[in-house]
Structures are given as C-alpha cells and as structure tokens.
C-alpha cells in the first residue's frame, strides 16, 4: 500500500489514513439532488472524489464507493408540479443527464448509487431508534424533529458551539419545534402534495427529511462505522453535522473516521449564483471546452482550495493538456503499467500521498513530458501515460485529442484537410506565398501544421 495522509475535517489536521479493515476502504460521498442539470460545482465534486477513488485503488486498496441520489425533496416536488409531470418522470430524466455528464468527465460509476426513495424503510427504522432514545420527538405540526441539544457531540465537525449557532442557519425557524436548532427527520404530508411524495409511517403520512436520507443509506450499504465520508464544503454544516448526530445517536458508535470536503467553485472571482448571472451547467461548459480539459482544470487545483472558473483558466488548462498529449503523439509506450520504483513515479506517489496534492503530482507529468521531448524516451512515455491514467487523464489517442479540441468558431476537420491539400498543391506549383498564406490562415484559426519527412502534414488545434 502507498502511504497516505489525508486532511480530516473532523480533526482539523492531516492524519495517516488507517482503514478500519486492512486493505479495504468504505467511502460515501453526498451526490446530486436530481431536479435540474448539474452545474460546475457538481462537476468538481464528481471529479474530485473520482480522483480519490482512483488513487485509493492505485494505492492498492479494495474500495467500496457509494454516492447517493436525492430523488425526493421540496425542490423536486415543486419542479414536477410546475412541469405537470410525475416526480418519477422528472428524476429519471435528470439522473440520466447526470450520468451522461459524469461519463463525459471521465468519472467511474460508483459501486452503489442508492436513491433515497428506495431506502425509506431504513430511514423510518433509524428515526424510530432516535425517538426511543429520547433524541427525536413529534411536534404539534406532525413533523418528527431531532432534539439537537440532547446530542452531546453536536458541533464537533463544524467547530460550532450551540451558543454560537444562529437559529435558522439553513434551518427554518418553526414555532412547533422545541428548540429553533432542532431539524426535521420526517416531514408530515400536506394535502396539496402529490401522492407519490408520501409514505405511511407510525407518525402519519409524510416523507423523510434531507439529512436522514444520507445517514440511512450510508449505514445500510457501508455499515454503522466506515472509513471516509466526502462532499462539498457547503455540506459541512448543517448537513454533515446532522448526519453525525443522527447516525451516532441511533447506533451509539462512531459514524465516520475521516471527513473530506472539497472547496468552493467561484466564477471570475465571484460566488456562483443564478442571481449574478454566472451560473453554468456542465453541458454549457462542454459546448465550449473538451471534457478532459475541464477535468484537467479541476484537478490542477488542490481539492480543498477554492477553484476559480474563468475562460482564461480553461484556455490555459487546454494549452497545458495539449503539451502533454503532444509529448505522447510520436511515442509508442507499449502499455501504461507504472514502474513505482522510478524517481518520477516516487515523486508522484509522494504528492498524492500528501492529501491528494494533484498540483504537485501534475508537475511531475510535465517533467516527464519534457524528458520525452528531449530524449524520445519510450520508458518516460509509458510512465507519463500510466501516472496520468491514475488521475483519469491522457487515456485517449493523442492525435484524436490534438485534432478534436473544442472551438466554437474553428474550422472542421474536413475544412482543415481541404486547406492542407490546397497548401500542398500550392507548394507543388512552387507558389510558396500561397502556401504560407494558407498556413497563416490556419494558425489564425488556432490550427498548427507540422510538416513531416516524405511530404505528409499533421495538424493539431493550438
């Protein structure tokens, strides 16, 4: 096993990773609420934890990776009613779109993708245990709430004391609650809501609260105590704090050993929001940029750092990824098995073992590319392809990538080939001024030509 230190939000420090069961890792990541297209913030969660999943496997661990799907909540109900469709029709469609976006970004499908609606019995069972222990109560409005002040460890993940917590922080104040900080476990049904949003329970018809869904699904699939729980930094409080209160309150055991949170995504140094008009879906971004460029851009930043999205940064990522593919285009690595005793691989593994430090790890890839360009080393090409593969990068044929870069206004491959043929004809007629004009025209359109021995001409997008 490669040594691994991971920043644990719960401990507020990097810690050596020691799995509960030697050689095996059980990991849960909070997934999407499926009522709309995934945005660039979702893309970061997908890619970051796919990177973690891939590296854990490369480091020799047997990984069970669970990422849930929230397919019932207020926003989903509201959107389905607005659209005049069933909840199932809405969520099935957006689950498909989510899978398409994830596949485009090179994300390996998790081992389990539990849907909240399939685990309502487990949620009711957990709520019953909490009520039996005096940690939950049914309020006068019919909701079942968690009594926050009765759980001694509340606030240990976020570092918030009960005195410091503001009533209503992402939790609406409700007169029926015994305490403003209490949160809902079971929402009583309203007459105006569609029948498919309601389940029977001993507390009356209703549906689960957001937080209980993840507690029940993670414990059902990974056990009451597992290794890693991840998600975006925005979920640290209250969602993950509430998960701890629910899961540990119900089981009496530690819930998760290590909590990971990826940083926020900003758009041109501003918070991403629909009101600011800087809200981008993955699909919108992929109209302008190759999906591997987007993945490269996300991994170029450390997962805990803020990620600033801008066209300039995406363009820079495209040029950088092009450099790596260009180094591989004339090589025949003959496989991509990594020699982990080789110095570049050791540096790469050290970086990844230091809290998944992808910026340092990726600098090793550029060192290898420089060596390939300098020496033509097949061994270096094999290392470059193999190490990049552990990040889900450089897995395509180099010529396919170099000729397929996204460009909204650029010429098509057919148009490029016609211009190359015209240039070749001009050279044959010794009309070098016309040949130079065509080369300049293509270069202005972002197409770089490279003349090869024997008269062939290769091209790539700049």
Curated annotation (Swiss-Prot):
- Source species, domain of life: Bacteria
The Enzyme Commission number assigned here is 6.1.1.16
Q: How is the cofactor bound?
A: Binds 1 zinc ion per subunit.
Cited Pfam families: CysS_C, DALR_2, tRNA-synt_1e
Motif 'HIGH' region covers 32-42
Positions with a binding annotation for ATP: 274
Q: Where is this motif: 'KMSKS' region?
A: 271-275
Which PANTHER family is this protein grouped with? CYSTEINE--TRNA LIGASE, CYTOPLASMIC, CYSTEINYL-TRNA SYNTHETASE
Q: What is this protein called?
A: Cysteine--tRNA ligase
- Organism of provenance: Cupriavidus taiwanensis (strain DSM 17343 / BCRC 17206 / CCUG 44338 / CIP 107171 / LMG 19424 / R1) (Ralstonia taiwanensis (strain LMG 19424))
